[in-house]
Amino acid sequence: MVQMKGFGILCLVFLVVFLMNVAESRRYPEFPMPYNDDYDKPFVKRCKGQDAPCSKSKDCCGEASMCSKGADGKKTCMIDKLWG
């Protein structure tokens, strides 16, 4: 009878330690959760505003904006005057 109580208490201690480890690992995950990863790889691709350097038209904000080469030879986001 005493051995069963000792075994039960030992199991209870192991269960409490296990649950504390699980709670601690959820608090400080080893692998960052997607919502915490905004610093290196943001989910939303940020678009570039007017006169920002660009490489493709889809980098620019707005439907009427496009990436075009200016007089200085650099590609920048511009709003098309006909549509914008």
UniProtKB/Swiss-Prot annotation:
> Which terms are listed as keywords in the entry?
Cleavage on pair of basic residues, Disulfide bond, Knottin, Nematocyst, Secreted, Signal
Q: Where in the cell is it found?
A: Secreted; Nematocyst
Proregion span(s) = 26-46
What do the Gene Ontology cellular component annotations say?
Answer: extracellular region; nematocyst
Which cysteine-cysteine pairs are annotated as disulfide bonds in the entry? Answer: 47-61, 54-67, 60-77
The Swiss-Prot or TrEMBL note on domains reads:
The presence of a 'disulfide through disulfide knot' structurally defines this protein as a knottin.
* Protein name, per record: U-isophellitoxin-Tst2
Organism name: Telmatactis stephensoni
